[in-house]
Swiss-Prot record:
EC numbers on record: 3.4.24.-
Organism this protein belongs to: Streptococcus pyogenes serotype M28 (strain MGAS6180)
Entry annotated with the keyword Glycoprotein: no
Residues that, per the record, bind Zn(2+): 143, 147, 226
Name listed for the protein in its UniProt record: Protease HtpX homolog
PANTHER family found in the cross-reference section: PROTEASE HTPX (PTHR43221:SF1)
GO CC terms: plasma membrane
Amino acid sequence: MLYQQISQNKQRTVVLLVVFFALLALIGASAGYLLLDNYAMGLVLALVIGVIYATSMIFQSTSLVMSMNNAREVTEKEAPGFFHIVEDMAMVAQIPMPRVFIIEDPSLNAFATGSSPQNAAVAATTGLLEVMNREELEGVIGHEISHIRNYDIRISTIAVALASAVTVISSIGGRMLWYGGGSRRQRDDGDDDVLRIITLLLSLLSLLLAPLVASLIQLAISRQREYLADASSVELTRNPQGMINALEKLQLSQPMKHPVDDASAALYINEPRKKRSFSSLFSTHPPIEERIERLKNM
């Protein structure tokens, strides 16, 4: 059951990424048709923009991400218990030892970052380290180490970059149309061509809806990677109850004291901001109750 869950989560992520690239291609083709009367040029430009933006975000400095989240790097001497758990989990996962950081915050939370296992880092709040016992900490750190081993940070970064690229292209296309853009051929003879009018309307609709759809796909990818990391943590620790107990404590945690931006929020094991009342479709994290239920069904 455990390996089946891991396999299913990986397959769902692949499907979502394929749909994401298809959406980026669609929005590029739509913008190309509306502005240049050339599908292919718009499609190629959209994919190039998406790849460049994703590449630049992937190689964002680990130290910068930690600084944005008020995390301080610690040594084995400063936090021996935390350091040794990270070391043990990294050894089991067969990845290099990540850098270790602590966030001075009473809430219960942790996250990992880094584009690859070779430049990764793990951070935990002081509240988490004080409240959780060793088995629960192993579950949480196993979750974060799994993110590193599974290249989740890179996948999530690509998803954020693609969503941003879709929004930018859609915004530029919409503004150019609003201020009189569009191909001359569309303005000259489009009114008499029913097919062209239908295509024009569909292209406009895609420009309007694409940013929302892109955000939903990006959030869905984030939620799938959380499920995968939960299951992968159990694979590392061989202790599902430790992870379940940790999630039950996380469920009672208060929001973090310092502001957390959207990109950073998706990295944490638990939503670090005040819980929102709207649909889980718009959440970076799946409901903790559902995560616990999946672990119990392994």
